[in-house]
Amino acid sequence: VIMAAGMGSRYGGNKQIDGMGPHNEVLMLYSIYDAVKAGFNKVVFIIKHDFEDRFRELVGDVVKGTVKVEYAFQELGNLPAGCSIPAERTKPLGTVQAILAAKDLIHEPFAVINADDYYGTSAFKTMVDHLEKLAPEKHACMVGYYLKNTVSEHGHVTRGVCDVDENGHLTSVTETYKIQPFPDGTIRDTEKDPNGVILNPESLVSMNFFGFTPWLFDKAEERFTAFLKSLSPTELKAEYVLPVLVDQLMHEDGLKVDVLSTDAVWFGVT
């Protein structure tokens, strides 16, 4: 599942379909080729109707001879029964809404990635091997990246900072919104303090490369519904994101998340 509907508020434009490779290839094409090489056999693109034609031309039609391709649409109005949002809201509702858009297309274990991140060939092989042995309920996995390999010299990034126990299970994931390197070589969280709180560069972080089973969907819908109902009418920007959902399911539903570490160096568009 490739989440490609985000608006890219900091980057501007549709960064998911801007050309970046040596021949102006779209970044996610590299991920798709790596995934197919590793053993994935279907890709579901989560996009918006307003750039569907361009997306099909630049991405979907390019790979449809290589892998089965399906489309799901993340639109603001796609809400669980009984939920509503303020008419003036324009910001997407987050990555949980994105994967829920694909609910009816997925009946097997699946991986989730961002369209605007490149994860490295080895990460896809690690993921596909683990998905093949994932228990059908209350189990998931996540490829963790070393924080030092995922920061940007060009501004702050958002990462899910992970705690992992001695058995390699995720114990918590904290969505951290303003991480950046400092001139002294440290990496800091600057969200609440401009001087920053120093983070361990060897910490594992989530880059939204998760592996799930279809068990997730009903749980995600329940939690997404609760999130929407908790919003005040004046809240126009709050999002419900995958690391927050995973953290809740671990603590409230007994979800076990195996952390698969990789030395791959991430790169993406921030």
Located regions from the model:
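N-terminal glycine-rich phosphate-binding loop and ensuing alpha1 helix
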Residues: V1-G60, V67-V69, Q74, A87, ...
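A short, conserved beta-strand element in the Rossmann-like catalytic core
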Residues: G8, Y118-G120
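Short phosphate-binding loop-to-helix
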Residues: V63-P109
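Short beta-strand-to-loop acidic/aromatic patch adjacent to the donor-nucleotide binding site
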Residues: E108-Y118
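Conserved core of the sugar-phosphate nucleotidyltransferase
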Residues: T121-F210
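Catalytic beta-strand/loop signature of glycosyltransferases that borders the donor
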Residues: L204, D258-V265
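Conserved nucleotide-sugar donor-binding
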Residues: F209-A220
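A C-terminal functional module that forms or caps the active site or interfaces directly
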Residues: E221-L255
